[in-house]
């Protein structure tokens, strides 16, 4: 608890050892795995964790205990690394819940998703339409949405500008197709699959106005506040974070906004400056205490715990 407020961070990447190994294996003309991992760590000034995800999970518990946070929603940030998040969540079920990234083009898409949602009890999926170059409204994804809906799961969908630092550090180009990066594509999907709670991270990551349109049209779409929101400097209206919060509150209300930090890299660990700045801003804006509690804890807890 930070002051009066409990914190359930809805956006934390669980960058495991397996994640980094999966990543460097994608690099063309690569050296051996150990060399690539050393090079990646040196370029990014980051730490590659040890092979045991449970030890990494314990480290994250220590980190959030230090900063007096209650819970984290952990992202398995690459297809194939679901098991790391599963082990973290199973070891610390009262501190962590988990999501996993899907590759819509995988021939084991449905088989794996069913296992992770039904057997492993992960809480939902992460979609990157522009990275995997498939529209969020493509009918190919409808069976996946039906499965998530049956499991009362969540769907995080990243739109707008995609920044993938680990790929940069590994020397792997991030090739995206911006035609799949518009949040408005989510409107027909959210209406068709009304039982799914969709979350657009990073206030739309530069597609802020489009994100607001989705919020007006679909009451089952949420937004998270994650990260530094560097997209604001490139947005035509150059909003500051106060204006972003004000407009988002007008459309989504306090009940559909989730605090997130976009933490993940070690040794930096938790981005406490993000939660500190956003909590201070909420108080300076005189957002009612009850609404601040929703944004920073209760909304995410309700989605994850099925309250």
Locate the predicted segments by residue.
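Active-site gating/metal-coordination segments in enzymes
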Residues: 70-71, 78-168, 173-177
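Active-site neighborhood of phospho(di)ester-bond hydrolases with catalytic His/Asp-centered motifs
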Residues: 7-10, 74-75, 99, 126, ...
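Mid-to-C-terminal alpha-helical segments outside catalytic/metal-binding sites
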Residues: 1-66, 71, 247, 252-256, ...
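Active-site environment of divalent metal-dependent phosphoester hydrolases
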Residues: 15-17, 79-81, 105-108, 161-165, ...
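Generic structural signal for well-ordered alpha-helices
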Residues: 57-61, 82-89, 113-114, 141, ...
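Conserved, mostly hydrophobic/aromatic
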Residues: 11, 64, 85, 125, ...
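Catalytic pocket-lining loop regions of alpha/beta-barrel enzymes
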Residues: 123-124, 137-258
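Glycine-rich phosphate-binding "P-loop"
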Residues: 32, 36-52, 157-179, 264
């Amino acid at each position: 608890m930070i002051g009066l407020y409990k914190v359930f961070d809805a956006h934390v990447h669980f960058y495991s050892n397996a994640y980094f190994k999966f990543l460097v294996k994608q690099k063309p003309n690569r050296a051996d795995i150990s060399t690539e991992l050393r090079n990646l760590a040196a370029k990014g000034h980051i730490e590659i964790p040890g092979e045991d995800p449970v030890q990494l999970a314990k480290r994250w518990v220590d980190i959030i205990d230090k900063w007096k946070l209650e819970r984290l929603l952990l992202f398995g940030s690459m297809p194939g690394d679901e098991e790391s998040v599963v082990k973290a969540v199973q070891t610390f079920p009262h501190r962590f819940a988990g999501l996993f990234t899907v590759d819509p083009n995988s021939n084991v898409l449905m088989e794996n998703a069913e296992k992770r949602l039904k057997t492993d009890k992960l809480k939902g999926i992460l979609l990157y339409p522009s990275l995997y170059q498939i529209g969020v409204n493509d009918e190919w994804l409808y069976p996946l949405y039906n499965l998530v809906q049956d499991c009362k799961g969540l769907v995080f969908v990243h739109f707008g500008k995609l920044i993938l630092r680990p790929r940069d550090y590994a020397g792997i180009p991030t090739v995206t197709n911006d035609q799949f990066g518009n949040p408005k594509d989510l409107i027909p999907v959210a209406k068709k699959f009304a039982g799914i709670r969709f979350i657009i991270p990073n206030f739309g990551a530069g597609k802020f106005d489009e994100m607001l349109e989705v919020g007006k049209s679909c009451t089952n779409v949420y937004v998270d506040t994650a990260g530094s929101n560097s997209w604001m400097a490139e947005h035509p209206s150059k909003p500051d974070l106060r204006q972003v919060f004000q407009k988002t509150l007008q459309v989504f209300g306090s009940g559909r906004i989730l605090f997130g930090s976009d933490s993940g890299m070690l040794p930096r660990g938790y981005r406490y400056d993000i939660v500190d700045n956003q909590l201070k801003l909420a108080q300076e804006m005189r957002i009612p205490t009850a609404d601040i509690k929703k944004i920073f804890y209760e909304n995410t807890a309700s989605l994850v715990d099925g309250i």
